[in-house]
Amino acid sequence: EASDGYNLENGQNRYSRGQWATALQYHDGKFYLLFTTLDEGGYLLTTTDIEGEWEKKKLNDGFYDCGLLFDNDKIYVVYGINQLRIAELDADFNKIPGNDKDVVKWSFREGLEGSRLYKIGEYYYIYSTYGGWPAFQTVFRSKDIYGPYEEKKLIDDDNIHQGALVETQTGEWWTMLFYDKGAYGRFPNLQPVKWVDGWPEIGENGKGVTTYRK
């Protein structure tokens, strides 16, 4: 909500208290922006014109580091840290009772978060990061939305992690991540993706590429 903190007025600020790992989806002619703040909770913003006005709705639930999926006539969200959950939502983006379940738990170490949810071919994919320092990217897959899921580490290279998978109009796959350089900040990092035996592979042999020729 508008406040002195968000407007950086009267000596106030909201650094590290704003949107966390926002999910953006386009479905049936509408853009959906789903996010949570640590203080106010969950919000959904929608529009038919991404450069125009957005309609804001305060949600009953907050979804930490969420990923949104429209799957046929159903709406799902993956969310959480360390223990990831998937919930089915109704048309008002409220949880449907009984359809909010634990699906995966961290395996390599704590810090599992920043998840995105996809249906690609016959698999559901949860694309997640192990945040902190050092950080790396991982993926889970299952043929059932609620699992069981199997996991594969994708890239473990100098803190390149956390982002989304994108398919272009020509069928190419890429991932937009960020390159965490500590005090220097976080730099956008685009990596090529290829699919091998139903798993995405990032960069070259699990290492990020700094330049890439098509």
Segments (PLM) and residue ranges:
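Carbohydrate-active catalytic/glycan-binding domains of CAZyme proteins
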Residues: E1-K214
